[in-house]
Amino acid sequence: MLKIAVDAMGGDFAPEVNILGAYEVVQDIEVEIILVGDEKKIKSFLPEKKETKGIISVIPADDVIQMDENISSALRRKNTSMRKAVELVKAGKADAVISAGHSGAMMALSFLLLGKLPNVERPAIATVMPCLKGHFILLDAGANVDCKPEHLVQFAFMGEAYHKALFNSQSPKIALLSIGEEGSKGNELTKEAFKLLKSSRLNFVGNIEGKDIFFGQADVVVCDGFVGNIVLKVGEGLAEALMKMLKREIADIITGKLGYMMIKPAIKSFRKKVDYSEYGGALLLGINGTSIICHGRSSAKAIKNAIKVATEMVKKQIYTRISESLNQTEERDESQNSVNRLLCS
């Protein structure tokens, strides 16, 4: 049975939503959820015991990393719920870790305790986003605000491996987010990254503009973490605003209530597609383990779905796939360099 460590104290609505999300999961699938945090509070929120497919255990931790806390001070404390949850993966006592707490601290702890995969220069946050054709993966969504062209290329390879594992795709289309479709447009980072991606083995379809990413023209959209996080937050805010505007417009017309009843199924379907809680959390790629960062205001449903994503990624050995993909790329590059040296000698 897989074991998933959950930082029970992380997030705006902790520990209740983390505990309820875990409880909902063990009713559906065979998995052990290890809740890490204030034991007394955790047990007070656990529903009465009944027969479930999975099990829930508790590991006490008497310290919590606050959402507005300085990362360096958070890392120095050894008994936080987040740190102890990540340490379970490091010790082999859990197969994956999930937290809706301080995202910067979660990234740093995952990086420091679990380490990077071989040949990975920078881990990246990969998030699944909705589009007209289903879903696409955006990375980096906030781990690295300053990048080199080579980092974006690695993000692309990691994103490809993630897409293949998540959606069973064969050759996902990779695009570089920029201000124009032409390779000559953008800043120095994107122009150089365009050249490198074009010469790679990836199914690189070129640059993609911000207005096109939600139309499904690419399966994986690559950018630095500064741009990616803005795209993510704009997408979330726009979806919420559109839902509110639609409800207001319906309420303002005489036949609003009747009209709403007629289109209610469509609105419900749309809300589900753009609701971040449906996707659980964002996977930290490039780490030697499965680490998922959830939204700070995650609901019980978001935590439940994040746990399910974690179990799927462990079963599909996502970090092994990423490592193999990058190793193959490294071998090709070394082989090509050897050929070039021979030609020049």
Swiss-Prot record:
SUPFAM superfamilies on file: Isocitrate/Isopropylmalate dehydrogenase-like
Enzyme class label: transferase
An individual GO BP term: fatty acid biosynthetic process
EC number, as in UniProt: 2.3.1.274
Pathway: Lipid metabolism; phospholipid metabolism
Main location as per UniProt: cytoplasm
Protein name (Swiss-Prot/TrEMBL): Phosphate acyltransferase
Lineage: Bacteria, Pseudomonadati, Nitrospirota, Thermodesulfovibrionia, Thermodesulfovibrionales
Gene that encodes the chain: plsX
